A protein has these predicted regions:
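Hinge/cleft segment of the Venus flytrap/periplasmic-binding protein
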Residues: 56-97
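Sec-exported extracytoplasmic/periplasmic mature domains
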Residues: 15-23, 45, 49, 66-73
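Short beta-strand elements at the ligand-binding edges of bilobed clamshell
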Residues: 46-58
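Hydrophobic alpha-helical
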Residues: 1-42
Length: 97
């Protein structure tokens, strides 16, 4: 079974319920959140969450600022600017603490 949460706050609540039910993340259920909150990332490091996704606010702000500068300077502006999400797992979680 897998629990996908729209944000880490939901994932942390789901983790409480999973533990209260006697289940073990990584053994009989998987748990993933979004936002890479420190508490969630620590739970990934500790093996209590399968992963989280970093919603790169710095990258988004940089893309928005760059697009704004292009617009103000009279340059062409793309309709969309994509900023990749970062998958945070046990392999890379420590660098996001």
């Amino acid at each position: 079974e897998v629990v996908f949460c729209n944000n880490d706050a939901m994932a942390l609540g789901a983790l409480q319920s999973i533990e209260q039910a006697g289940r073990t993340v990584g053994t009989d259920i998987y748990l993933v959140g979004v936002d890479a909150l420190k508490e969630a990332v620590q739970n990934v490091v500790d093996g209590k969450m399968t992963g989280t996704v970093l919603n790169d606010d710095v990258g988004q702000a940089t893309a928005a600022a760059n697009a704004t500068k292009l617009y103000v300077d009279g340059s062409d502006v793309d309709e969309y600017y994509w900023v990749d999400y970062v998958k945070v797992t046990t392999e890379n979680a420590a660098q996001y603490l």
